[in-house]
Design a protein with these regions (language model features):
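A Trp-anchored, charged/polar loop motif used as the substrate-binding/catalytic surface
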Residues: 1-5, 114-119, 162-169, 236-249
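SIR2/sirtuin-family catalytic core signature
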Residues: 1-18, 24-28, 234, 245-327
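Gly/serine-rich nucleotide phosphate-binding loop at the start of the catalytic core
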Residues: 1-132, 137-140
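Active-site metal-binding loops of divalent metal-dependent hydrolases
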Residues: 22-23, 139, 185-186, 263-264
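Short secondary-structure boundary/capping segments
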Residues: 31-39, 148-154, 302
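Short coil/turn segments at secondary-structure boundaries
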Residues: 31-32, 195, 273
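Short, flexible loop segments at boundaries between secondary-structure elements
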Residues: 47-53, 164-181, 282-301
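Extended, H/D-rich, highly charged conserved domains that either
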Residues: 53-91, 120-121, 125-235
Length: 327
């Protein structure tokens, strides 16, 4: 396993891209951006006791894993001609779980960009500056905040997210050269039924993006969010949204080298890796956190090689990667 700096030395910045997983956000604050914390803060309403007991039954805090098992149970019961009322309840509970995930992520998210220090933003901006195109699977705003901090070094780091005034996605305009892609949506993105919009800080009203999202949730208006439990269902949702579908298709257009940071290579995101495998990317650099011989990391390494085969895959140390702080 090599270090991050060595991986940079082996690649050319002009053809180097990155896919960010949850490890990017966890490297800023592990407590806020992990499933255990979200589970402890989640409230599933009148179904709270039942749904939480399912997490406990499977000994996991992973929302997507539980959703997958619930839907699989409903499918099995349906095949055995089980009680239709019970099957419908399981599927309803799955929707409650999905909506609760969006709610708890929003509730636990830092309200203001000032929660992140200027020093941390500068480190993150230097990290992101190393890549031509940035793809993320994260819903939170940390990367979005970092790229928008234009008054902080490096000043040359400027990216195009495809949105133009009035905060509308406009990727097909001639003056748009999108470089930032939220593959599974994000808290600040929403579909108003006509176009894809994004929340921006309202200076006049002094209303933060997170506050705007919370106000929308109170009115049952949800952000653009892909949290389906399987890669098949995620693909279905992506194909039915113009922004998500466009971002997804850009993966196949890539060439050069692709870094993948902070992802455990779960089966539920295989649609992403299938698209990357069919791209013209020469080599993948995949981060590994902790002991590379641990059971978890051995599974990650095996999945990365399997999902991206026959491409060349190189592994680098996540701890050697300076994102928010000096490594």
């Amino acid at each position: 396993m090599i270090k991050f700096a060595q991986a940079l030395d082996q690649t050319d910045r002009s053809a180097r891209h990155i896919l960010l997983g949850n490890g990017f956000s966890q490297s800023w604050n592990h407590e806020t951006f992990n499933y255990k914390y979200l589970f402890e803060k989640a409230n599933f309403g009148v179904r709270d006791a039942v749904i939480k007991s399912i997490f406990q039954k499977f000994e996991t805090y992973d929302f997507e894993t539980v959703m997958f098992k619930m839907l699989a149970s409903a499918d099995v019961l349906e095949s055995y001609r089980g009680d239709p009322t019970l099957i419908e309840q399981i599927r309803t509970d799955t929707e409650i779980l999905k909506e609760s995930l969006i709610q708890v992520i929003t509730d636990c998210h830092p309200t203001l960009p000032s929660r992140v220090s200027d020093e941390e933003y500068e480190m993150a901006r230097h990290f992101l500056y190393e890549f031509k195109k940035i793809f993320t699977l994260n819903y939170d705003l940390l990367m979005y905040w970092a790229r928008n901090k234009s008054d902080i070094e490096p000043e040359a780091f400027k990216t195009d997210d495809g949105f133009r005034w009035p905060e509308t996605w406009s990727a097909y305009r001639e003056d748009v050269h999108q470089q930032v892609f939220f593959l599974h949506g994000a808290l600040h993105l929403y579909d108003n039924g006509v176009s894809i919009k994004k929340h921006a800080y309202d200076e006049d009203a002094e209303v933060s993006i997170v506050s705007q999202v919370r106000m929308n949730l109170r009115n049952n208006k949800f952000p653009l969010f892909v949290s389906e439990p399987t890669h098949f269902k995620k693909s279905e949702k992506i194909k039915h949204n113009p922004y998500l579908d466009y971002c997804f298709r850009q993966l196949k257009q890539l060439n050069g080298d692709m870094f993948i940071f902070g992802h455990s290579f779960d089966e539920s995101d295989k649609h992403i890796f299938d698209e990357l495998k069919n791209s013209s990317v020469n080599r993948f650099y995949v981060s590994i956190y902790g002991n590379e011989n641990s059971e978890h990391n051995l599974r990650t390494i095996a999945n990365a090689r399997t999902f991206l085969a026959p491409k060349d895959v190189v592994f680098f140390s996540a701890e050697s990667t300076p994102i928010w702080r000096v490594a």
